[in-house]
Amino acid sequence: MLSKKPNILVIGDLMIDHYLWGSCDRISPEAPVQVVNVKKESSVLGGAGNVINNLFTLGTTVDVISVIGDDNVANELKSLLEKIKISTSNLIVENNRKTSKKSRLIASQQQVLRYDMESIDDINEESHKKIISNLEKNIKKYSSIILSDYGKGVLTTKLTQDIINIANKNSVKVLVDPKGKDYSKYKGSYTLTPNKKEAQEATNIDIKDENSLINALKDLKEKCDLEVSLITLSEQGIAIFDENLTIKPTVAREVYDVTGAGDTVIASIAFALGNDLNINEAVSFANLAAGVVVGKLGSATTTLDEIYEYESSLHKSNSNSHIKTFEEIEKLAAKLHNLGKKIVFTNGCFDILHVGHVKYLEEARSYGDVLILGLNADSSVKKLKGESRPINNQDDRAYILASLESVDYVVIFEEETPYELIKLIKPHVLVKGGDYEGKDVVGQDIADELKLVKFVDGKSTTNTIKRIQENEKCNN
């Protein structure tokens, strides 16, 4: 357990990420553009602010130094920081500067437009002096410094080098989320956290195999005089090079959104190092944190409890973790709806699994993003099929079905029909067998769409049981 609450300083470009959510169903009569009916809007900390958010949710003590304007966006930014109890006393105001705000217009879960209002000029000399003065007074209280560079003018080459020099004199590690192609301004820092594309641009090395990866890591380490070089490799994990190459594989099970995952990585590494983990252990911890975050929508964060729970779940049976109770599936379905995922629902007894079942479920899964299967409990099967059924009990049937790639979640229901379960899930697509053609299907008044899937001819549990019984007669 990581129990320390290290004091970490974040210096960089603060901004507001502003979201407008709505729907679009017509074209403007004034110009060939979509008309979006905005239904809600929200604002969150962006840029270096997302790093701060990540550190805060991990339980870290966080200080921030940045330069902002004297405007409404700055006031909004301060308010968001104060909500998470982050001091704004070290935010330096330049009157002619625009505080960065990025607005994204999202319609039907698709981003259709982004517009930015900001200044990207270098900060002035007075701001530079104030930052250095503040740092020199307080440097000894920090376990590490994160430089979050978004190229908006705060982290000038001179300021960056001055920060690194002061930190090194006081044995404080500097971790950098870099920007641009020239990384020379970060020389002397502890490590950088570029992604693969950024590393390729900075080193002019095409990373296509292990040798080219090592060459890129070596190039970064030598040119920037790093203690350790890192490259984040998306779904492949994180590559580390001190004297030898180590790749920490990703541990994400479900990826919904990678937005802000880089901020989670650098924050988690700094937090772990502040808890006396070595760099390999810190990167493993960061991989777990990123695994949680990419399962959420937008620039998300994670808590220590979520990380520990996630790590624990990775060691559990994969099939068991996909078998849910009514309460669990209700919460999960709500989350999936919020993430904009298309939910497919089907149900049945699935007593003796055969190829017809498998093909049916594969087709059902193709109609959306997530397939939830309602499984008749043993008592329900007996009512439908007779006292001799089921052949396999409900736990065995659920486990086997949950192990199929096409099935995301299984829920056992005791009732004669899955109507109450469907009400909880509110699926977008309801799938039933082709033999329901022209018949009423339970739950079709709840789902947006009904799909009827043809069965494979001659394949059924009843036929399978008959063949087994006939073979037994022949053998007796």
From Swiss-Prot:
Region (Cytidylyltransferase): 345-476
Annotated Pfam families: CTP_transf_like (PF01467), PfkB (PF00294)
List of residues binding ATP: N195, K196, K197, E198
Keyword annotations from UniProtKB, A to Z: ATP-binding, Carbohydrate metabolism, Kinase, Multifunctional enzyme, Nucleotide-binding, Nucleotidyltransferase, Transferase
Keyword Transferase appears in the UniProt entry: yes
Example GO molecular function: heptose-1-phosphate adenylyltransferase activity
Any single biological process term in GO: ADP-L-glycero-beta-D-manno-heptose biosynthetic process
This protein's GO CC annotations: cytosol
Keyword flag Phosphoprotein: no
Region (Ribokinase): 1-318
Coiled-coil ranges from the UniProt annotation: none
Catalytic activity as recorded in UniProt: D-glycero-beta-D-manno-heptose 7-phosphate + ATP = D-glycero-beta-D-manno-heptose 1,7-bisphosphate + ADP + H(+); D-glycero-beta-D-manno-heptose 1-phosphate + ATP + H(+) = ADP-D-glycero-beta-D-manno-heptose + diphosphate
E.C. numbers: 2.7.1.167, 2.7.7.70
Residues of the active site: D263
InterPro entries in the record: Bifunc_HldE, Cyt_trans-like, PfkB_dom, RfaE_dom_I, RfaE_dom_II, Ribokinase-like, Rossmann-like_a/b/a_fold
Pathway: Nucleotide-sugar biosynthesis; ADP-L-glycero-beta-D-manno-heptose biosynthesis; ADP-L-glycero-beta-D-manno-heptose from D-glycero-beta-D-manno-heptose 7-phosphate: step 1/4; Nucleotide-sugar biosynthesis; ADP-L-glycero-beta-D-manno-heptose biosynthesis; ADP-L-glycero-beta-D-manno-heptose from D-glycero-beta-D-manno-heptose 7-phosphate: step 3/4
Function as written in the Swiss-Prot or TrEMBL entry: Catalyzes the ADP transfer from ATP to D-glycero-beta-D-manno-heptose 1-phosphate, yielding ADP-D-glycero-beta-D-manno-heptose.
Subunit and interaction comment: Homodimer.
Annotated family: In the N-terminal section; belongs to the carbohydrate kinase PfkB family.
Protein name: Bifunctional protein HldE
Species this protein is from: Aliarcobacter butzleri (strain RM4018)
